[in-house]
Amino acid sequence: MLSKEEPACRQFHSREKTWGNEHNGKTVTQANNKEHKVPAVRRGDIGQREPAAHPASHIQGTMASENTGEQATCKDQYMDLDAPGNNLEHSWLHRHCEIPTTLHQRAKKTGRLFSGLFGLNLMFLGGTVVSSVALSNKAVPERDSQSFLCILMLLSSVWALYHLLFIRNQNGAVHHDHHAGAMWLKASLAIFGVCSIILSIFEIGHALLLQNCEILMDIVFFSIEIVFVSVQTVLLWVSCKDCVQMHHSVTRYGIMLTLATDILLWLTAVIDDSLEQDLEILQSNSTQDESNEMAQCQCPTDSMCWGLKQGYVTMFPFNIEYSLICATLLFIMWKNVGRREKLHSDPPRHTFQLRGIIYGPLIGGAALLVGISVFVQYQVEATSGMVSILSYHMYYGYKMIILAPMIVCSVAGIIAHSLREKEKKGQKETGRSDQDWLHMEDVGSENKNTDYSSGQYQSSQGDEKIQGYSLAQFALDNEKEKLEHRQGNTTKKHNTHQGKMKNYTRKLDVTLLFVSAVGQLGISYFSIIATVVTTPWTMLSALNFSNSLLLILQYLSQTMFIIESMRSIHEEEKEKPGHHEESHRRMSVQEMHKAPPSCLDAGHLGLSRRVVKEMAMFLMICNIMCWILGAFGAHPLYMNGLERQLYGSGIWLAILNIGLPLSVFYRMHSVGILLEVYLHA
């Protein structure tokens, strides 16, 4: 009986030999040394199997052969991960644990717990400091929060350089998670990072041109932010796929420090952006002395200082998105620290193509052009301070026009996914039936060839017995496969030596999608209540009510479509592409002629796939337009006055300042996921 300290592969080999001794009376090694090859259960081996001596021994031999294959896979690909010389994680709390792999798992969980608590407390502390500047009526000076953030950015930059220059250069220090760090995410990281650096440059120029204001701390803060953004962008571009196997504690705490810094910078940018939106209200409620003090640090509208201010105000949405993207990538890196799972091979690369996709890009492009025209026209009037009723009607009318088709497209995409799943199930059953008949024919032909080569005469009655026996043998094989499918064949569906390959990126995407959707849903429900209570109803009230209701339906339907699409992608990734490729390679020319058209026409873009691609492309373009409407310039929710009359300026502005940043992130995050859906469909 083996002890638990032995590696998993050796235990599996021992169980394999024990099973063979109990049921066959012979070891698996002896079974493999026979001249008679044991047939495999895989359908790709049709045409290569030989009849066994007895159905029961056939099933036993098959299971023995499969276990041997799994042992080879485990030994060749994954045994090196748990070898004694490798870097297993240790923890002082679990020092009495004598099993290395168990100690590694417990130490990993303990490291996640303490580093997570460290990051959480740091976020709460920094969030209190940053928000106190805006809520304490200048009792907490802004330079205190800037000094705190400067310390965090410097420490994070030092850790990032240490990770890039020291940890990653050691042998065996890094494995890779191929699910993390999608190309569209890295491209967004680079673009938004450049925009954040430009924002800091504009802030420095704006601070230098101000007079009678304290500018030294502002210059220091934005200079350090430029260094931090540059180092962090390089770190995440290079290391976003890393599964670090050395210096686990330093890496976890460094990642949490950097992640907390990004969250606090995001909160600072959200507060600054909200204060720019609320500036007129703050000035109207302030005293004369406060207004004079605020006017001393304002730029004339016709100066270069005013132009730089408009520049960094325009860059706020990019900086907000940059901080959130960095936080998501860092969270995946933190989850992957100490992870000792490896894929069999790299996942397939998907290229962006518009072949056969016409209506989605065409209609979406038209909606984008019209939306930009409406947006520019509204912002011109909002900048002048006088927004006409016609501009409100055009703004809300345009949103209603695009929201209704987005709802229809989301529902159509969900239906297309269900039809596609049904079609794939039918093709799988058809292919299995055809392969079964091919197997029966091959078994019969092999029996006849064997009889003729041995010179033995077979009567018609003997042929019927052989065919009946072959059918019985095949029925036993088929029942065994169905039983394994129902109970779950753990040796086949696990991609790693420690279990099923986890995809932390996809789980995080779904979580962020749900959390960010709460912002717009809350705003919409508050708007609906305010519109219903306010009397009498006007055209603007009706448009606001309809727009809020359509937004709720659109968020719910699009979220369901995205989740259903990601589930479909996950189901496709669970299938073994190498197994199917091997099966197709083993098909002879005669079998290809006998195969149904559905098996040979796999590259054809079916109706359900085309519908999913069309819907994903249209929704992606419309979400880009909705992101532009919510992220840039003035927003009608600040200016129409319906909700402000019911809730008051302070409460309504607080609702908007919390909900709108989440809504903006939802749109941008949806664009990335919809692009992934389009590529995988």
Curated annotation (Swiss-Prot):
Keywords: Cell membrane, Hydrogen ion transport, Ion channel, Ion transport, Membrane, Transmembrane, Transmembrane helix, Transport. InterPro entries: Otopetrin. Residues 1-26 are annotated as: Disordered. It is a multi-pass membrane protein. Changing residue 666 to A/Q: Reduces proton channel activity. Coiled coil: none annotated. pH regulates the proton channel activity from both sides of the plasma membrane. Low pH activates the channel from the extracellular side but inactivates the channel on the intracellular side. Zn(2+) and Ca(2+) can partially block the channel. Homodimer. This is Proton channel OTOP3. It comes from Xenopus tropicalis. The gene is otop3.
